[in-house]
């Protein structure tokens, strides 16, 4: 944010969450992606949703919002989960794969990426009602409404024309070179709603 404010760059467009706290310091474009915090677990197993985690070992990546959320869920709902904090997403997946945990909690798009890299991606499912949702947007300076309008209009045109859905299918539902990994990640209802009605609302 300081680099944006001092003019080092004019806008940033990656996986930056648009939230109320950040809106105090920066403006955000229309949302480009919506993620939900869900679970990766063995296909056909006993875990279908968060309630099934009672008394079970669950892995989460250390230092993430998902880690905070999982501890909160465990305390508030008295679920007696054994929470394992792994150093990165790859380590979290290895903990799941080895059977030391029954589920891995994280943003659904990141879970799809880890599943795609697995030896047998078809053995794993992303399940559960999203415990939180985050909107990713391009971040720009607060004092430039004309620039924001240009970015928003461009995003809205791509989303409402059907072009964004084509891009989504290409990158999330088909093999990606050079390793030909396929994320097999479906367009969520939140994303479908976003493409119909582009907006810059924070979800948290």
Predicted feature residues:
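A ligand-binding cleft/hinge motif common to bilobed small-molecule-binding domains
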Residues: 14-24, 69-74, 97-98, 102-132
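Acidic, polar ligand-binding/catalytic clefts
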Residues: 1-52, 192-202
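Ligand-binding clefts/hinges and TM-proximal coupling segments of bilobed small-molecule sensing domains
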Residues: 65-83, 122-123, 155-204
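Short, Asp-centered acidic motifs that coordinate Mg2+ and/or phosphate
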Residues: 6, 10-11, 102-103, 137
């Amino acid at each position: 944010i300081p680099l944006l404010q001092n003019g080092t760059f004019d806008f940033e467009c990656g996986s930056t969450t648009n939230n109320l706290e950040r809106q105090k310091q920066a403006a955000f474009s229309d949302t480009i992606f919506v993620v939900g915090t869900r679970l990766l677990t063995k296909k056909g197993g006993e875990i279908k949703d968060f309630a099934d985690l009672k008394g079970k070992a669950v892995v989460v990546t250390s230092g993430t919002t998902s880690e905070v959320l999982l501890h909160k869920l465990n305390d508030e709902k008295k679920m007696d989960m054994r929470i394992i904090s792994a150093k990165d997403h790859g380590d979290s997946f290895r903990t799941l794969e080895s059977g030391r945990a029954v589920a891995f909690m994280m943003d659904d798009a990141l879970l799809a990426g880890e599943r795609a890299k697995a030896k047998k991606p078809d053995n794993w499912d992303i399940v559960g009602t999203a415990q939180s949702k985050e909107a990713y947007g391009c971040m720009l300076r607060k004092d430039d409404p004309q620039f924001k309008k240009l970015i928003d209009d461009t995003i809205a045109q791509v989303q409402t024309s059907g072009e964004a859905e084509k891009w989504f299918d290409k990158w999330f539902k088909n093999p990606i070179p050079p390793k030909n990994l396929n994320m097999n990640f479906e367009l969520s209802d939140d994303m479908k709603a976003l493409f119909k009605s582009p907006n810059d609302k924070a979800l948290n």
